[in-house]
Amino acid sequence: MAKTDDFKAKTDDQLAEQLGELKREAFNLRFQAATGQLEKASRVKEVRRSIARIKTVQTERARSAAK
């Protein structure tokens, strides 16, 4: 699981790319959970929180750019 500082060090393009990857992974994990094939249930929580961290960094940057 990545820390917020790791996300802050990345560019906007890198964050957008990683956000897309995490969203795809979250979809796949939800699908696995629905079909009973999920091996690590904790990964769902990690991915969800990483998505939230990326969105938080993006919002912070958007607000600081608007000032």
UniProtKB/Swiss-Prot annotation:
Coiled coil: none annotated. InterPro entries: Ribosomal_protein_uL29, Ribosomal_uL29, Ribosomal_uL29_sf. GO terms for biological process: translation. GO terms for cellular component: cytosolic large ribosomal subunit. The keyword Ribonucleoprotein applies. SUPFAM superfamilies: Ribosomal protein L29 (L29p) (SSF46561). Keywords: Ribonucleoprotein, Ribosomal protein. This is Large ribosomal subunit protein uL29. It comes from Sphingopyxis alaskensis (strain DSM 13593 / LMG 18877 / RB2256).
